[in-house]
Amino acid sequence: MGREVVEVLMDRNADVSSARVHVAPKIAAEETDEEFEVKECTEEKSLSENAPNVGSAERVGAQKSPKTRNGNAKVSKQDAPLLAVRKPLQPENKKHIDDEDNCSIASSVATSMRMGKSGLTYGSAPTFRSAQRAEKRKEYYQKLEEKNQALEAERNELEQRQKDEQEAALKQLRKNLKFKAKPVPNFYYEAPPAKPELKKLPLTRPKSPKLILSRRKSFSDAVSSSSREEILKTVSNRNRHSTGTVQNKDDDHRNKNTNAAHDSPRVRSGKGKSGLKPVNESSEEA
């Protein structure tokens, strides 16, 4: 559905240079074309009063299609009672009839010129912005690279600072844990000390009389000690007395031993161990 301009009202005062236009759009019910047209408010009066203006208007109307003419005629018939009603309500319209007619004609000419020029195309050189965009992109990436480099430098500086702090703390810790003594004592490098010579004890140790008295004597110890004493006595007697007296004592001692051996039960029964001889025989053989 197309739209048509039903009414154009322009109020122009003598003191004000700018004009105000009131446009009331109305949709035509019967037309199906998409063309837009302008209808003058007072077309009939302008034709009767201004002859040259009417001629120009006829020329403009000649350029229009027959469909648009029929549409204008229908619209003018429908708008006639509206204009008749508005005229007595607005008495100022009578004073500015000429100005309104001139404006309406100028507007119609402008619309026709626009419609005529709509099909024309003027050649113009294309404007390429790729170079400008490339420059902007280059600047953007350059700034981004500088920002990344600054961040990388700051990160490296922070890492170096942390490393220095750790090394300083480690040195201080080692200094606190340092021992005053040498790590290896001197005796590790010195020769071992000389071992003292062990004195060999004599084979027969002298016995003190106190130990002998305090120790309990067994039967064998008593016999051995008594025999030793007797031997020592006999040796001393031999040196003092003559040989005859010593032989007599020895004979007496031997006789006592033989008598004791004969009195034993084994000798009496005659059952002795093999290899043993009676005491008398041994004494006789000696």
Curated annotation (Swiss-Prot):
Coiled coil regions in record: 131-182
S-S bonds: none
Name under which the protein is recorded: Protein WVD2-like 1
Keywords linked to the UniProt accession: Coiled coil, Cytoplasm, Cytoskeleton, Microtubule, Phosphoprotein
A Pfam family matched in the record: TPX2
GO molecular function: microtubule binding
Gene Ontology terms describing biological process: circumnutation; microtubule cytoskeleton organization; root morphogenesis
Modification Phosphothreonine, positions: T32
Subcellular location: Cytoplasm, Cytoskeleton
Listed Polar residues bias regions: 234-247
InterPro entries membership: TPX2_C (IPR027329), WVD2/WDL1-4 (IPR044806)
Biological role: Microtubule-associated protein (MAP) that regulates the orientation of interphase cortical microtubules. Modulates both rotational polarity and anisotropic cell expansion during organ growth. Promotes clockwise root and etiolated hypocotyls coiling, clockwise leaf curling, but left-handed petiole twisting.
Biased composition (Basic and acidic residues): 38-47
TM helices/strands, residue ranges: none
Spans annotated as Disordered: 31-101, 186-286
Keyword Phosphoprotein listed: yes
GO CC terms in record: cytoplasm; microtubule
Species of origin: Arabidopsis thaliana (Mouse-ear cress)
Family statement: Belongs to the TPX2 family.
